[in-house]
């Protein structure tokens, strides 16, 4: 299977702080990769370099096997990369359709009718429930997230990055999102999920890549790993969670770490 994106020895520093150090990572087309790590491990910084928010100090980014230079989100879009951030970048007083086409040529008049038609086609293809004419301020958080995803797909994204996408969702909304992401994978898109939730990693992804303190630890097949292994990769030591039964008269379970 062909690689959609590859990172080779990517490093990023902020002053004396090393956010990412010689990180190597690859994601294939038609694959969901979970980027796992504790808070501060460098996950979002790494993805922000792919999406054009930051520029790496050193290293290479390859799209479809060719080295590229990404200095802005506009550059990222030109390479069919879309990132859905935790904090949505939408204009509240605009409709879903207006946000999706914002910045494109001919976004008014006849072209808007064609844009709306395309938005509906994308929604039907991936199972989104979106009203193109609904104002953003009238939407729930999950609906706003849907607009961001459709916006990326509308602009041709084949590589989608989602930063902690379930942090604002209910369990039912999370289940619905995962169904959509699997459809994208089956359609040949590369999907990267930034997360620290182990149970979601194991239920959704095909592979898991782990970062610790800004460094790449390794990548494992989801079907061949478990929470204990992933936790050890995240923190650098074994942590076993065992429930030990206390004396009967206390009737209290103790968590031993």
Where are these regions (language model features)?
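Glycine-rich phosphate-binding loops of nucleotide-dependent enzymes
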Residues: 2-257
């Amino acid at each position: 299977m062909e690689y959609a994106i590859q990172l080779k020895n990517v490093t990023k520093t902020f002053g004396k702080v090393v956010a990412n150090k010689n990180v190597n990572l690859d994601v294939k087309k038609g694959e969901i990769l979970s980027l796992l790590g504790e808070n501060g491990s460098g996950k979002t910084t790494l993805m922000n370099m792919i999406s054009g928010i930051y520029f790496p100090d050193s290293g290479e980014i390859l799209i479809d096997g060719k080295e590229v230079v990404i200095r802005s989100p506009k550059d990222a879009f030109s390479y069919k990369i879309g990132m859905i951030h935790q904090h949505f970048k939408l204009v509240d007083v605009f409709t879903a359709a207006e946000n999706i086409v914002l910045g494109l040529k001919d976004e008014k008049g006849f072209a808007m009718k064609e844009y709306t038609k395309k938005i509906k086609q994308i929604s039907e293809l991936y199972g989104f429930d979106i009203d193109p004419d609904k104002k953003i301020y009238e939407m729930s958080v999950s609906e706003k997230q849907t607009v961001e995803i459709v916006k990326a797909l509308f602009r041709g994204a084949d590589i989608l990055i989602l930063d902690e996408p379930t942090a604002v969702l209910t369990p039912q909304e999370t289940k619905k999102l995962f169904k959509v992401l699997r459809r994208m994978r089956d359609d040949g898109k590369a999907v990267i999920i930034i997360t620290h939730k182990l149970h979601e990693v194991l239920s959704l992804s095909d592979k898991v890549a782990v970062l610790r303190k800004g460094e790449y630890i390794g990548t494992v097949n989801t079907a061949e790993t478990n929470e204990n292994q992933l936790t050890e990769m995240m923190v650098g030591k074994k942590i076993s969670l065992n429930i030990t039964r206390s004396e009967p008269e206390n009737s209290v379970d103790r968590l031993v770490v």
